[in-house]
Amino acid sequence: MNQIDYYQAKLDFEIDSAELFAALQADQRKLVVVDARPAAAYAKEHIPAAINLPYSNMSNAMVRKLDSDKLYVCYCDGVGSNASTKGAFNLASLGFEVVELRGGLDGWKHDGYTTETTHDASSSA
């Protein structure tokens, strides 16, 4: 694979905070934001409207209720964490269209977007 193909492929499977925010504002029904971190991290802080689907628990049974016609955007803490990559890999392996949020939750906050908390860490898919 040459450099151009590599970077094009990388761009095809990533989204940045501004793109995600715009997509959520335009039509939230077309995508699902997936927090691939453990439930405790999700409960402490997550992107609004995100569902918690820890990468370590993804299975056919767990994702059965997910809509295969939607685009799934996986994220984790950010640089230094690969939970979103593992989550994206798992979802793609199960037949879902998925991209990764570049910069994760740290990048989302750094770009000035809000987060929320939940007391019910079981509010997953």
Predicted feature descriptions by range:
Residues 1-32, 36-41, 117-125:
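Flexible, polar/low-complexity N-terminal or interdomain linker segments that lie immediately upstream
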Residues 64-109:
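Catalytic cysteine-centered active loop of the rhodanese-like fold, especially the PTP/DSP P-loop
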Residues 23-24, 59-69:
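Short amphipathic alpha-helix with an adjacent loop that forms part of the alpha/beta core around
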Residues 42-48, 108:
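Short loop/helix-cap segments at secondary-structure boundaries that form the rim of catalytic
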Residues 51, 68-69, 115-119:
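Short, hinge-like loop/turn segments at secondary-structure boundaries
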Residues 40, 59, 80:
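Glycine-rich nucleotide phosphate-binding loop and flanking beta-alpha elements
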